[in-house]
């Protein structure tokens, strides 16, 4: 009976300790991307702004200054290094009459820093038609700043 209690206590202790570990904890040295960011985008046509929100479950959402010709974007992200992340999102494209004409698939590589609330990145954009055939590509530079809660 004593041995059974010891084993049971050991299992409960292990389960309790495991319960306090954060999901996906890898001993990371930076807080990561989770949160909301305002991003300056250097495009071939000029500088623009995007809002990116990275969720802890690996999904993320993008909205930008290209509305109404580009929808909000939905995508996924993951950590690929200590301060490096890759992400992919898809957004729908519309013409000036708001007719659906295709999509964009954007792949992003982000390096966080120099502080915990900044990042730089590169995005490779694939412009696609209604049959999902690539009809153009471009590359843009990103500079992100974490959106912080400000005192009321």
Question: Language-model features: where?
Answer:
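Hydrophobic/aromatic beta-strand elements that line small-molecule binding cavities or substrate pockets
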Residues: 50-53, 73-79, 103-114, 124, ...
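Bacterial N-terminal signal peptides
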Residues: 9-19
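Edge beta-strand at a domain terminus
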Residues: 125-152
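Tryptophan-anchored aromatic micro-motifs
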Residues: 30-46, 75, 121
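Bacterial N-terminal signal peptides that target proteins for export
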Residues: 1-11
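N-terminal glycine/threonine-rich, aromatic-flanked beta-hairpin/loop signature
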Residues: 47-85, 91-92
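A short, structured loop/turn motif at beta-sheet edges
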Residues: 30, 57, 78-85, 109-120, ...
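Boundary at the C-terminal end of the N-terminal hydrophobic targeting segment
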Residues: 21-29
């Amino acid at each position: 009976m004593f041995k059974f209690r010891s084993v049971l206590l050991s299992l409960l202790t292990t389960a309790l300790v495991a319960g306090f570990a954060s999901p996906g904890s890898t001993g990371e040295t930076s807080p990561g991307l989770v949160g909301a960011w305002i991003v300056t985008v250097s495009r071939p046509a000029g500088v623009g702004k995007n809002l990116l929100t990275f969720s802890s479950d690996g999904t993320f959402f993008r909205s930008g200054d290209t509305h109404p010709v580009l929808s909000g974007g939905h995508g996924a992200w993951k950590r690929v290094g200590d301060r490096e992340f890759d992400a992919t999102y898809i957004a729908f494209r519309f013409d000036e009459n708001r007719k659906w004409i295709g999509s964009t698939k954007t792949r992003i590589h982000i390096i966080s820093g120099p502080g915990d609330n900044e990042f730089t990145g590169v995005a490779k954009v694939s412009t696609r038609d209604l049959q999902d055939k690539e009809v153009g590509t471009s590359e843009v530079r990103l500079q992100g700043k974490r959106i912080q809660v400000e005192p009321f």
